[in-house]
Curated annotation (Swiss-Prot):
Single GO term (MF): adenosylhomocysteinase activity
Catalytic activity: S-adenosyl-L-homocysteine + H2O = L-homocysteine + adenosine
UniProt-recorded name of the protein: Adenosylhomocysteinase
Cofactors required: NAD(+)
Gene name, Swiss-Prot/TrEMBL: ahcY
Similarity annotation: Belongs to the adenosylhomocysteinase family.
Keywords from the named record: Cytoplasm, Hydrolase, NAD, One-carbon metabolism
Cofactor note: Binds 1 NAD(+) per subunit.
Role: May play a key role in the regulation of the intracellular concentration of adenosylhomocysteine.
Length: 469
């Protein structure tokens, strides 16, 4: 749909350039062909309209793949209002195509922090007043937190929240433990078809792409340090190894550390004997002085701290593929060092003091996406086939919570329903099956004898809840 086809009088949006809508529509059509699970759900549930009456507040990266998600939710009966969960991740053509379809969206690439907060507010507000929303779809937890702190009255009507990423799940669990969470939540992040696809295989595809687009560097033969070896770290380490880099890994969890060793990565610590006492003396300068690229992947704070940044090799590339920009101590970098913009989302950070700098100085770091998500800041994120699993899970989670009708329960029953849970394994398998069919794969069916032997049904689920894929 082009801007010319926008519903007459529709102004409930703010995007960078509405004239990009036709471009966004062309890319969305291609993405649909690469998202068999999501489009399969659209076809399967279209007649049933399971989200009829759902009013969804959405905050997730406003990409082409998200456009397919939004239009699937709408096709299944929902109304939505949307914003992006990151100031750099919006693809402006995608936002324009959604606005041109008459769907409220507030997102553009390169928002300021103030503009980001404004966009979150506009997601919640319609005509200046809180919209009568009854569902939340979030990525990172900013929208959920804003609703709890500033618009708690909206939550009286909300049936639940579906959360996309590790960081947001951590925030939900913290709120639940403190008794602050007002609605039930589905942890989409830990569905197997999300965590293994998006977190691992997606990062394997998109990290090296972003670094090469941002720097035009050859990565082969250079040394990389990946901070963290969860699913995101695993995919990131593989991504860099594919480029021929010499990859080292730093980890705090002995199990993940063991996996790194078993996968053939050298396990190191940026700190002498692995102990960070907060001083420069604890830094392994010999290690960091050889590192050409450092990537943070943890969802934790200051895992690349000021002392590490001081010790890195001259002209090293620094980037983050975790959700927030606090994994790298960019606050220290802004306060103490001079920033030179090379191009959007690429800065030379001169370690010669704050203020002015000598353009010929060679003691600098190359910081990508200002320490925010590098794969969406410097590239276009994960491919459609990867996001297919994540967003199919989001649709199923929205349907699941909407049908539970938490907001309509009597007060005495609500307390026991305030949980943060993953989707039932049967739904995870449903998403996986549609993805396999999209690859042209054929899944073998158990015989009744085989199913009985291992204690499952022929239709599944096929693994116990505790199984680790």
């Amino acid at each position: 749909m082009s801007a010319a086809n926008m519903p007459a009088g529709f102004t409930d949006y703010k995007v960078a350039d509405i004239s990009l809508a036709a471009w966004g529509r062309r890319e969305t059509i291609i993405a649909e062909s690469e998202m068999p699970a999501l489009m399969g759900l659209r076809r399967k549930y279209l007649a049933e309209q399971p989200l009829k009456g759902a009013k969804i507040l959405g905050c997730i990266h406003m990409t082409i793949q998200t456009a397919v998600l939004i239009e699937t939710l709408v096709a299944l009966g929902a109304e939505v209002r949307w914003s992006s969960c990151n100031i750099f991740s919006t693809q402006d053509q995608a936002a324009a195509s959604i606005a041109a379809a008459g769907i409220p969206v507030f997102a553009w690439k390169g928002e300021t922090e103030e503009e980001y907060e404004w966009c979150l507010e506009q997601t919640i507000l319609k005509d200046g007043q809180p919209w009568d929303a009854n569902m939340i779809l979030d990525d990172g937890g900013d929208l959920t937190e804003l609703l709890h702190k500033k618009y708690p009255q909206v939550l009286d009507r909300v049936h639940g929240v579906t959360e996309e990423t590790t960081t947001g799940v951590h925030r939900l669990l913290d709120m639940l433990a403190k008794g602050e969470l007002k609605v039930p939540a589905i942890n989409v992040n830990d569905s197997v078809t999300k965590s293994k696809n998006d977190n691992k295989y997606g990062c394997r595809h998109s990290l090296n792409d972003a670094i090469k687009r941002g720097t035009d560097h050859l990565l082969s033969g250079k040394q990389a340090l990946v901070i963290g070896y969860g699913d995101v770290g695993k995919g990131s380490a593989q991504s860099l190894r594919q480029e021929g880099m010499i990859v080292k890994v730093s980890e705090v969890d002995p199990i993940c550390a063991m996996q790194a060793c078993m996968d053939g990565f050298e396990l190191v610590s940026p700190f002498i004997d692995g102990i960070n006492d907060g001083t420069e003396a604890s830094i392994d300068k010999a290690l960091l002085g050889k590192i050409d690229l450092i990537v943070t992947t943890t969802g934790n704070v200051n895992v690349c701290d000021a002392n590490m940044l001081k010790a890195l090799k001259k002209r090293a590339v620094v980037c983050n593929i975790g959700h927030f920009d606090n994994e790298i101590d960019t606050a220290f970098m802004r306060k103490n060092w001079a920033w030179e913009e090379v191009k959007p989302q690429v800065h030379k950070v001169h370690r010669t003091g704050a203020g002015s700098f000598d353009p010929q100085n060679d003691d600098y770091l190359i910081l990508l996406a200002e320490g925010r998500l590098v794969n969406l800041g410097n590239a276009t994120g994960h491919p459609s086939r990867i996001m297919d699993g994540s967003f199919a899970n989001q649709v199923l989670a929205q349907i699941f919570l909407f049908e539970q009708k938490f907001a309509d329960l009597p007060a005495e029953k609500k307390a026991e329903r305030l949980t943060v849970e993953v989707l039932p394994k049967k739904l995870d398998e449903e998403v996986a099956l549609e993805m396999v069919r999209g690859f042209g794969g054929v899944v073998t069916q158990l015989t009744k004898q085989q199913a009985d032997y291992i204690g499952v049904t022929v239709e599944g689920p096929f693994k116990p809840h505790a199984y680790r894929y």
